[in-house]
């Protein structure tokens, strides 16, 4: 296996990229950490040439359709470099906390939905066609093309809603949180523990170095698992 292939294989491990992010965010001087050429190189390495380094500067003025198109372009350009951002320990925590009929919002390629569908009736939604199709194939559950902050479901249509590695991408965080609380009695959320920088190798718009904002939005209790916050409320 070539050096590049070995590096890519290691980067597919979420725990490895957590360690790398900690080095970059906590130990590099800000003048280096925010150096645009370094971030451009890293973004291309992780996500391919379609990655927009200035996305977070523009996203708050974009429509939901424009944001969905940006993610579709990133996905089409090879932007998905790992099977899922949710680690096995996080998936285990999610499945242990889920109850009854489950909605997954931001299903990606279906890694979480696949596990949930083994024990629960599951409906999954995502804003990109590729993700929705892959989830349908992999999890065998009902899938819809939809996303936050407006879900096409009645109040309390589900017992549990799962939203893993999605909230940090939604411009209107308060509206998204209210929508998750509306459709289900129990909310399970996973977000990265990450501090803000102008340039990050992702399309994150919100940052959670502490779980306090998450608990304020949903109540419940947040636990740090494999470097990410996992919150269960309701």
Predicted regions and their residues:
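Conserved acidic residues
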Residues: 100, 159, 185
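Activation segment
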Residues: 152-155, 170-171, 198
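A conserved beta-strand element that flanks and buttresses the S-adenosyl-L-methionine
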Residues: 162
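Short catalytic micro-motifs in class I SAM-dependent methyltransferases
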Residues: 165-169
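Conserved beta-strand signature within the Rossmann-like core of class I S-adenosyl-L-methionine
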Residues: 184-196
């Amino acid at each position: 296996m070539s050096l590049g292939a070995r590096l890519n294989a290691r980067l597919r491990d979420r725990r490895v990229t957590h360690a790398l992010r900690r080095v970059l965010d906590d130990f590099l001087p800000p003048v280096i950490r925010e150096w645009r050429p370094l971030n451009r190189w890293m973004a291309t390495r992780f996500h391919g040439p379609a990655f927009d380094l200035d996305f977070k500067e523009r996203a708050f003025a974009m429509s939901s359709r424009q944001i969905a198109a940006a993610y579709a372009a990133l996905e089409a350009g090879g932007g998905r470099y790992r099977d899922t951002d949710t680690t096995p320990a996080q998936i285990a925590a999610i499945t242990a906390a889920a109850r009854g009929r489950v909605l997954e919002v931001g299903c990606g390629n279906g890694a979480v939905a696949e596990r949930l569908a083994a024990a629960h009736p599951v409906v999954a939604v995502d804003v990109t066609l590729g993700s929705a199709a892959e989830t349908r194939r992999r999890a065998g559950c009902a899938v819809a093309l939809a996303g936050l902050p407006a879900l096409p479901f009645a109040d309390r249509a589900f017992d549990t809603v799962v939203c893993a590695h999605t909230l940090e991408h939604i411009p209107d965080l308060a509206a998204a949180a209210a929508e998750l609380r509306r459709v289900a009695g129990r909310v399970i959320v996973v977000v990265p523990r990450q501090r803000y920088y102008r340039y990050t190798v992702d399309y994150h718009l919100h940052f959670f170095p502490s779980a306090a904002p998450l608990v304020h939005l949903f109540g419940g209790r947040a636990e740090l698992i494999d470097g990410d916050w996992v919150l269960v409320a309701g």
